[in-house]
Swiss-Prot record:
It catalyses: Cleavage of peptide bonds with very broad specificity. The lineage of its organism: Eukaryota, Fungi, Fungi incertae sedis, Microsporidia, Unikaryonidae. Its EC number is 3.4.25.1. This is Probable proteasome subunit beta type-2. The active site is at T7. InterPro entries: Ntn_hydrolases_N (IPR029055), Proteasome_bsu_CS (IPR016050), Proteasome_sua/b (IPR001353), Proteasome_suB-type (IPR023333). CDD domains: proteasome_beta_type_7. It comes from Encephalitozoon cuniculi (strain GB-M1) (Microsporidian parasite). GO terms for biological process: proteolysis involved in protein catabolic process. Its main location: cytoplasm. It is an enzyme of class 3 (hydrolase). One of its GO terms (cellular component) is cytoplasm. The proteasome degrades poly-ubiquitinated proteins in the cytoplasm and in the nucleus. It is essential for the regulated turnover of proteins and for the removal of misfolded proteins. The proteasome is a multicatalytic proteinase complex that is characterized by its ability to cleave peptides with Arg, Phe, Tyr, Leu, and Glu adjacent to the leaving group at neutral or slightly basic pH. It has an ATP-dependent proteolytic activity. The 26S proteasome consists of a 20S proteasome core and two 19S regulatory subunits. The 20S proteasome core is composed of 28 subunits that are arranged in four stacked rings, resulting in a barrel-shaped structure. The two end rings are each formed by seven alpha subunits, and the two central rings are each formed by seven beta subunits. The catalytic chamber with the active sites is on the inside of the barrel.
Length: 227
């Protein structure tokens, strides 16, 4: 059975960079196949992407585009732009007319500034201040639209996590933990399992007093025959 990431992935710009966040659940039909998979992929030193849809398709497209950008960098001795990654992915996906189940959120920083794009499986793309894709994107985008504003790094991380959490709590195919990636001019910071969702807050074991169940009557049955 095909493994799908189900997924709630989020991307947003903040004052000095870009935040990407994703849940960590992948499914095979109604079964959770992996509770802690990685949906955030590194493309170059300052370009990252999140993948939703079919797990194999999303990771293969990201790896293919990463190879293209690294070949460009080695050939021309120039750092590739985020728009270069966007172009490689959209042209590749458009050739297959939506047959490749990969929806991507791309974030990065280059010589032209901070960039955030959403790329759909049929090859269309859009630039945005914030975006969410995947089966849990409805809850996530509602959180982003109601609370997004000019923010610093810590505020942006909290909002991105809350958006993914909203997707997780309203989507059976999203769950487990939240991974966060911060991209700014100093580099990339990947925060693995930054927040756990759905874990019981009360971890104390229940202890019952010995006299909590009182014996009101005692009766002995002789069921062994004596010879």
């Amino acid at each position: 059975m095909i493994t799908k990431t189900g997924t709630t992935i989020v991307g947003m710009k903040y004052k000095t960079g870009v935040i990407l966040a994703a849940d960590t659940r992948s499914t095979q039909g109604p079964v959770v196949s992996d509770k802690n998979c990685v949906k955030i992929h590194q493309i170059t030193d300052k370009i990252m992407c999140c993948g939703a849809g079919t797990a194999a398709d999303a990771s293969r497209v990201a790896r293919m585009a990463s190879r293209e950008l690294r070949l460009f960098q080695n050939k021309y001795l120039r750092l590739p732009l985020v728009s270069h990654f966007r172009k490689v992915c959209t042209q590749h996906l458009h050739k297959y007319g939506g047959g490749i189940g990969a929806a991507l959120i791309v974030g990065g920083i280059d010589s032209e500034g901070c960039h955030l794009y959403e790329i759909h499986p049929h090859g269309s793309e859009n630039s945005a201040l914030f975006v969410s894709l995947g089966s849990g994107s409805l809850g996530a985008i509602a959180t982003l639209e109601s609370r997004y504003r000019a923010m610093d790094k810590d505020e942006a991380i909290d909002l991105a996590c809350d958006a993914v959490k909203a997707g997780i709590l309203n989507d059976l195919y999203s769950g487990s933990n939240i991974d966060v990636c911060v991209i700014d001019y100093s580099g990339v910071e990947f925060l693995r399992n930054y927040r756990r969702i759905g874990v019981s807050e009360n971890t104390d074991t229940l202890v019952y007093p010995l006299d909590s169940v009182r014996i009101k009557r005692e009766e002995v049955f002789d069921i062994v025959e004596e010879y």
